[in-house]
């Protein structure tokens, strides 16, 4: 079975876990900062579920976080989990939040994979029911692969 199919099957079987969230060192905000690598920070989703990124508002799963990534070589980007557990992202001039390919479902955004010199990068999400992490990679010049694999 292809990795993407396994991912879809696992995520489809996962049940929402509003009270659960991906493990974090600091429940309010976590930051990773380094001059030569990808930096990112998290913003807790408020009770209203609404958060902006680059001027675009989205509605996200309560108890989750929206991650803002400062990619080294490409446009900055935001990632969040919608109320239906789908994975969304936005970037400057994107025109709004866009659903990521691959039919992935998750309970929280976990972290960003460092961006390579060629622009390759990734985003990792967490699924509460299996306590597993899944990654989708960005492969220039094609873009996001649309395939979720175990991280």
Predicted regions and their residues:
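A structural motif
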Residues: 22-151
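Secretory targeting and sorting signals
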Residues: 1-23
């Amino acid at each position: 079975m292809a990795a993407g199919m396994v991912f879809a099957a696992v995520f489809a079987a996962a049940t929402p876990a509003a009270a659960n969230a991906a493990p974090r060192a600091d429940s309010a905000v976590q930051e990773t900062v380094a001059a030569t690598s990808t930096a990112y920070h998290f913003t807790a989703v408020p009770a209203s579920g609404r958060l902006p990124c680059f001027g675009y508002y989205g509605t996200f799963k309560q108890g989750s976080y929206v991650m803002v990534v400062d990619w080294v070589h490409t446009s900055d980007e935001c990632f969040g989990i919608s109320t239906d557990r789908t994975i969304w992202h936005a970037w400057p001039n994107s025109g709004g939040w866009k659903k990521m390919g691959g039919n992935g479902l998750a309970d929280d955004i976990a972290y960003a994979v460092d961006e390579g010199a060629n622009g390759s990068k990734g985003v990792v999400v967490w699924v509460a029911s299996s306590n597993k992490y899944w990654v989708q990679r960005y492969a220039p010049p094609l873009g996001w692969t649309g395939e979720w694999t175990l991280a």
